[in-house]
Amino acid sequence: MPPLSVTAITAAILGLIFFRLSMNVIGYRRQHKVSLGSGGHDDLERAMRAQGNFAEYVPISLILMACLELNAAPWWLVAATGIALIVGRLLHAKGINEPPPNFALRVLGMKFTFFNLIALSALNLGWVGLRLLG
């Protein structure tokens, strides 16, 4: 399998999700005629936070996935982390954007994201550590 294939597919899917979240923000900005901030509109604020939160957590997760994949971790292990990241980000976005917001979905999405971030960090430390020890 070519290097970073799993990470590339995951990044492509996440890129499309980010595009959708961005279009959601733009739509609310146009609807409410707000160019900066949320203008006190709850729906715009939620859309902005869904997009912002995505932008905060996805890059480090993709970097950790790429590190794991470049260090010859099994493709299925890298893919499992990618799936967990995608599921977590979708749940969070749905939970925060639903009117009224679905707090349980939002929290579940963050749990997926945090667990995945910790798992990716631990996997990188363990996998690379074992490879270095021979």
Q: Which positions does each model-derived feature cover?
A:
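Physicochemical signature of membrane-embedded alpha-helices that form the seven-helix bundle of GPCRs
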Residues: 10, 48-51, 81-84, 109-116
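Juxtamembrane boundary at the C-terminal end of a transmembrane helix
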Residues: 122-134
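N-terminal signal-anchor transmembrane alpha helix
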Residues: 2-32
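Membrane-embedded alpha-helical transmembrane segments of multi-pass integral membrane proteins
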Residues: 14-17, 21, 84-92, 116-123
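Core segments of transmembrane alpha-helices
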Residues: 53-65, 117-118
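Short alpha-helical packing/oligomerization segments
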Residues: 66-87
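Interfacial loop-to-transmembrane junctions
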Residues: 91-118
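Cytosolic, membrane-interface loops and tails of multi-pass inner-membrane proteins
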Residues: 23-48
